[in-house]
Amino acid sequence: MGCLCLYRSTLLTGGLLFLLMLADPAFPAGSRPPVVLVPGDMGNQLEAKLDKPSVVHYVCSKRTDHYFTLWLNLELLLPVIIDCWIDNVRLIYNQTSHTTQFPEGVDVRVPGFGDTFSMEFLDPSKSSVGSYLHTMVESLVSWGYERGKDVRGAPYDWRRAPNENGPYFLALRKMIEEMYQLYGGPVVLVAHSMGNMYMLYFLQHQPQDWKDKYIRAFVALGPPWGGVPKTLRVLASGDNNRIPVIRSLKIRAQQRSAVSTTWLLPYSYTWSPQKVFVRTPKANYTLQDYRQFFQDIGFKDGWSMRQDTEGLVEATVPPGVRLHCLYGTGVPTPESFDYESFPDRDPKIHYGTGDGTVNLQSALHCHTWRGLQKQEVSLQALPGNEHIAMLANTTTLAYLKRVLLGP
């Protein structure tokens, strides 16, 4: 979602053979619908340039002459060095303006808007641990698409919620209109995880006649429409996503500073208001208790962040375009948390079903839009598919090919 984890996926065994099988060189050029790929949380690179008045450790760089990769750079996640990274990647929330700011002397930018490189591999070294949308893009290329032309990427600053990314949506709309003109037809949006929430926000803010003209379809992969309980654990005690060299408490402050985390807390239109997500020796917390939850974890800014973002997407307002929802099932997915010591110790996790990150009932919110829009809404379960692995899954890629090129 957006995944709230480091993106880690590997090429499937026999993946190259599968790509060759999908290749369709006979498909007439120019008749493919253009494609825009939208990543999830932590799903594209970020770059930073420094001119800081001070640093948190003597090993940290105070000034850089050029932009460098802030995410994902595996070298920056090493012990001690990670303190430098946390200090640079965090956001500072302003209670007066209800916006976030970069730390003093840190400038962060999103590289590669319109290209796919920053989301194919999150680590510019192209290490397998940072592979994200590479297999999907390679599949598109094998079907006749060309990077940076009729398949483009729309990366964004995933630390922020849509209300702080206004210029991004203007650039996205302009790019879609340009691709329509260049390639003679409407665009197919393909989003993953939190990128689906971004696209829902975008589409809810476009006139219907614009959507009818410029958007052919919206393919939503692992969509967290109703929010995910995992965010409560991230906010309370941090989440190292099973990376042993990183302590959860070490990165908790940085994870809390990302407003997009509070945006993805569970919503009442999907989850029962009585469902207990967090149990502690002193209190239990449902989605009606967020204000108290933030107070008890010592993060009062979180309540303001939630109030700022809770109404950004309207659950009862469908996207207004042809929609394909693909979601993982059968993978143990965090649903509630028991703390013996709250909030500074890891909890016992209780699991439901989903894709390991997005719970099934959150993804299935797609179903409620049937009958609320004239455009068709299709749902496709992906049994046993994990949140990231689904992006390279043969079923997913075959489904996408049918959407783009037909039977």
Swiss-Prot record:
This is Lysosomal phospholipase A and acyltransferase. Detected in brain (at protein level). The gene is PLA2G15. It comes from Bos taurus. Glycans are attached at N94, N284, N393. Residues 1-29 form the signal peptide. It catalyses: a 1,2-diacyl-sn-glycero-3-phosphocholine + H2O = a 2-acyl-sn-glycero-3-phosphocholine + a fatty acid + H(+); 1-hexadecanoyl-2-(9Z-octadecenoyl)-sn-glycero-3-phosphocholine + H2O = 2-(9Z-octadecenoyl)-sn-glycero-3-phosphocholine + hexadecanoate + H(+); 1,2-di-(9Z-octadecenoyl)-sn-glycero-3-phosphocholine + H2O = 2-(9Z-octadecenoyl)-sn-glycero-3-phosphocholine + (9Z)-octadecenoate + H(+); 1-hexadecanoyl-2-glutaroyl-sn-glycero-3-phosphocholine + H2O = 2-glutaroyl-sn-glycero-3-phosphocholine + hexadecanoate + H(+). Substrate binds at D41, M194. Keywords: Acyltransferase, Disulfide bond, Fatty acid metabolism, Glycoprotein, Hydrolase, Lipid metabolism, Lysosome, Membrane, Metal-binding, Secreted, Signal, Transferase, Zinc. Belongs to the AB hydrolase superfamily. Lipase family. Its EC number is 2.3.1.-, 3.1.1.32, 3.1.1.4, 3.1.1.5. The active site is at S193 (acyl-ester intermediate), D355 (charge relay system), H387 (charge relay system). Transacylase activity is completely inhibited by Triton X-100 and partially inhibited by heparin. Moderately activated by Mg(2+) and Ca(2+). Disulfide bonds join C60-C84.
